[in-house]
């Protein structure tokens, strides 16, 4: 799998099912489709490291599970999956959990969709420098759609909308003149369940237009 995703212009299918024990972060290249639905039986589960989209545009990932856990390489950025400053990404029928930081964070992306996914069971005390954590994710972007997702069993950020935080004046770049231009999000038909004593679904600084249904 690592060899396949390290090169662009790939459609990846599976002849077998089971666990893939990652030895480092899995970086997905551009112009890639990972068709997890082609795996027989119980499908494909990635373990121990992050599924990362920070270097990829034009990507489709379907029916993949990512279980980060604290078994290896505990660090403050250990999400089950994440990516920002990318475009044209679809995550469909995936399941993400057991993160040290956030389960699934996607913001500052353009033309992004996460649909029919499970974002659950962020680890509470897994070695994060800030102590107890257990966060669902930071979401947002320009023309970003989050629909029919299940967010459950996290302490906080279920999710947190903060999606234009690095694409307006005052942060990394001046791609847009302000946060209102930088963010347009559609959030609908999602279920948020069993968040902890922190905030459930809420907004942070650097936000723009968010449609919640």
Region spans (language model):
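Solvent-exposed adhesion/ligand-recognition segments of exported proteins
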Residues: 1, 12-15
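Extracellular beta-strand-rich solenoid/capping regions of secreted or surface-exposed proteins
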Residues: 2-8, 19-35, 42-63, 68-87, ...
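Acidic/polar N-terminal loop/beta-strand segments that form early-domain functional surfaces
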Residues: 14-17, 37
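A cross-family glycoside hydrolase active-site/sugar-binding cleft signature
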Residues: 15, 105, 160-162, 201-202
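Right-handed parallel beta-helix
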Residues: 31, 36, 57-68, 85-98, ...
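Beta-rich catalytic cores
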Residues: 47, 77, 100, 133, ...
């Amino acid at each position: 799998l690592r060899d396949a995703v390290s090169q662009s212009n790939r459609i990846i299918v599976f002849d077998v099912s089971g666990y893939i024990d990652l030895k480092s972060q899995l970086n997905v290249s551009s112009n890639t489709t990972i068709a997890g639905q082609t795996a027989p039986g119980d499908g494909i589960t990635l373990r121990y490291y992050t599924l990362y989209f920070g270097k990829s545009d034009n990507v489709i990932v379907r029916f993949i599970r990512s279980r980060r856990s604290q078994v290896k390489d505990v660090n403050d950025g250990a999400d089950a999956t994440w990516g920002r400053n990318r475009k044209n990404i679809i995550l469909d029928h995936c399941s993400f959990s057991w993160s040290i930081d956030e389960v699934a964070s996607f913001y500052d992306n353009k033309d992004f969709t996460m649909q029919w996914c499970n974002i659950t069971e962020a680890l509470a005390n897994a070695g994060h420098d800030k102590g107890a954590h257990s966060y669902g994710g930071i979401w947002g972007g320009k023309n970003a759609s989050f629909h029919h997702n299940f967010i459950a069993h996290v302490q906080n950020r279920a999710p947190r909308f903060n999606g234009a935080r690095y694409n307006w004046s005052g942060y990394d770049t001046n791609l847009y003149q302000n946060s209102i231009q930088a963010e347009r999000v559609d959030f609908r038909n999602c279920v948020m369940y069993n968040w902890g004593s922190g905030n459930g679904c809420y907004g942070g600084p650097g936000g723009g237009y968010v449609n919640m249904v």
